[in-house]
Amino acid sequence: MQNEHILKGVKSVERRLTFKDVKAIVKLGLVQGNLIPAFAGAFIAIMLSGRSFLSSIPELLTMLFGTTLIMAGSCALNNFYDQDIDSIMPSKQNRPSVTGKVSTASILQLSLVLMIVGEMLLFTINIETGIIGFLGIFGYVVLYSVWSKRHLVSNTIIGSFPGAIPPLVGYAAIEPSLSSTAWMLFVIMFIWQPAHFYALAIKRSEEYALAGIPMLPSVKGFKRTRLSMLFWVMLLLPTPFFMQELGTVFMVLASVLNLGWLLLAISGFRSNVKENKWAMTMFVYSLNYLMIFFVMIVVVTLIQTI
């Protein structure tokens, strides 16, 4: 009898939720990566509108917290919905939603609470910010997770819409009337995503095929995917010249970033290219690209106001 109590205690400890489990459920890395564009959108709105940074801190912090919650909630709901296919893919079989360490009911409750509280915070800033945040939730959960991910080869492109929402949320929190610069941030993030996610999909093409997810590399193959990646990278080339408000230095530096990615994309057409190695190089470059691009926006905008 005593041994049974001990065994139950051990199992309880083993199943206790850890911070690592929470990170996996809400996809913390993805959330953190999207906070940089959200902050950059808000910062550029502050600088271009002539508002004081200090007076904008309440809206800025509320926006960042609300955005964190709606993204975390959306990702948790994605984990809830994708349990069946995640259990098939080796890279995702250790997720708490798959192992059973966290019940499906708990994941669903967590996701709904996070999204509701996050939306409430965004609506306290202004109506526009709340609506844009809701569009992000709808796009990721409904248009991507439920509708396109399992049925359309264009799922990555459709998923790029909600993925490009963060800078708009940030900008609207400070200036509800979105400027052309705000929309360009949206366009750039939209264009950036296919090449980024196709690179990862090349490495996991067999997994996606096993799970029946029609990702481009799994359906059309490597040669077709690298053409698509080159196309999307090329679309980035003119974008800096639509952001003249940020100055010549920014346009030059952003163009250098774009050209570097273009050269890397072209290198994928070599006859002796190692597909997975090239894809991961593209993936890493895309991550650095996004971080450098938005940090550069903040720095350049700050310098202009000094």
From Swiss-Prot:
The chain crosses the membrane at residues 28-48, 53-73, 105-125, 127-147, 156-176, 182-202, 227-244, 246-266, 283-303. The keyword Cell membrane applies. It comes from the Bacteria. Its EC number is 2.5.1.141. Gene3D superfamilies: UbiA prenyltransferase (1.10.357.140). GO terms for molecular function: protoheme IX farnesyltransferase activity. It is found in: Cell membrane. Pfam families: UbiA (PF01040). Keywords: Cell membrane, Heme biosynthesis, Membrane, Transferase, Transmembrane, Transmembrane helix. The keyword Signal does not apply. NCBIfam families: cyoE_ctaB. Converts heme B (protoheme IX) to heme O by substitution of the vinyl group on carbon 2 of heme B porphyrin ring with a hydroxyethyl farnesyl side group. Belongs to the UbiA prenyltransferase family. Protoheme IX farnesyltransferase subfamily. This is Protoheme IX farnesyltransferase. The gene is ctaB.
